[in-house]
Amino acid sequence: MRIQYKNWFMLFVLLCVVVAGLYGISGRLAGNREGAENRKEVWAVSKGKSAAAGGTRGTLKLYAGELSGRATAYHWETAGDQRVLSLLYQKVGDLAEVTWQKKGKGAVYRIRLKKDVMDSDGKLVTADTLLYNYYMRCQASYQGDDEIDGMSIRGLRTYRYGITGKKLRQRVKKVKQEIRKPDKKLRQQAVKELAIPVLYREYYWVKTLYYNKSAQKICDRYPEPVQLFAYYYAPDTSYTGKGKTVKQAVQDIAKQYGTNLEHLAEMTGRDYETKLQGMAIQYFWPDRAAGAGKIQGIQKLDDRTVRIETTGYRESDLPKLQNIYVVTRQCSGNASGEKESGAGKSGRSLPVGTGAYILQEEGKNMLRLQVNSYYHREAVNPTQIVIQNGDLTASRCIRSVCDGTFDMACIWERAEYEKKEISSTMKKGDALWESALLGGLVYHPGRVNTTTISKEAADTGDLGNVIRGLEMN
């Protein structure tokens, strides 16, 4: 009996030794694997690449809404454009603390950058970067959506016209006269560079009325968005837009405006006089297109701080200064987005920014974004985002999420209008027919980690903040 007990005891000890050995080996293997992954990540970041790049697990298939194909850091036309730009760029308000105080009739704004902000080239963003962004938007040649050039910044008019005193007043008078009675060349320039981009954006706004219940009556009168667009924006009331394509209608209406943009200003709530003045300055004095000298009211205080002084205070000035996208390297020297180096496999290039992603490829109806490895993110993926263009209903988006075409789709504009259709589509009951809705965001819970989606961002339509914290399953 004692011998049998001893044999069992020896067998037990032997098993313990074997298990301990296996556990130690597996632990070393796991540790080695983890160390290798860590080294891989460190190496990849040091090379300016993502360690997970190229893997399907890190790729998000996204529908962001309809895209115009003409968006840049300075101009957008659709809600989808804005969402994509929020992934590529950050605004001054995201990167800096802006404080201000009144001074006489004007105000002084102090813009101080956060520490260690880098762009997608891996270069530090400094006060010189801010100067570059503000000066560029003050030039006579600038025709972007921003309105920095319309602010009463001290010394701005001298910078734009390149002269002071009596001659400055003479030039201002000459420009105003030319705008009132433009020649053919200036009129054509105003149509092409100012009226057409603005009208495209307004057309896309008109389209949103067709899924807005409060606008149903007027939309019923004009079954085609082009016709309603003409009703709202054509100065010639006899122009109906009937039988016209969007491009034809936009060009026709833009020609009706020329340099007389008062009706357009009433419709959009924006002042285009400064942009027209800039065109006239370029027309008469081409050497002043990029400004002359320094702007007295824009000063660099230190490596991270810029001071801007205005001679007249307006409540709208603060958001104008905060809401511009920061770019660190220009592609074409203007706001048109014409082709140059800097944006991978696309027909045009976008300026370098500080957003979470960079544009890697642009196809006919597709964008491919690659992670900016210099951007500090909460999540390790998605490392790539493939964005499909289109004008899809909410129900179509849900079906596309369910069948795997998209992992996530933005339906903020349509969520309320298509409420019944959305509810019906999501009640299919098939086990494979799976999707979830948070705010105006449809996603597949099997492919997207639900716990990493910010409810606040989903409720407010902030795609940038949704993506920055997102994890894929």
Residue spans of the language-model regions?
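N-terminal lobe/hinge region of extracytoplasmic solute-binding protein
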Residues: 61-113, 121, 135, 352
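Sec-exported extracytoplasmic/periplasmic mature domains
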Residues: 118, 130, 135-143, 313-315, ...
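A structural "hinge/loop" feature
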Residues: 63-86, 315-331, 466-473
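Aromatic- and charge-enriched surface segment that lines or borders ligand/interaction sites
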Residues: 98-272
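Gly/Pro-rich hinge or "lid" segments in bacterial periplasmic/extracellular proteins
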Residues: 78-79, 266-296, 302-305, 309-396
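Beta->alpha turn/N-cap motifs
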Residues: 65-67, 133, 311-314, 410-416
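Extracellular/periplasmic solute-recognition and catalytic clefts
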Residues: 64, 360-368, 388-473
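Gram-positive cell-envelope targeting signals
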Residues: 1-53, 57-63, 72, 406-408, ...
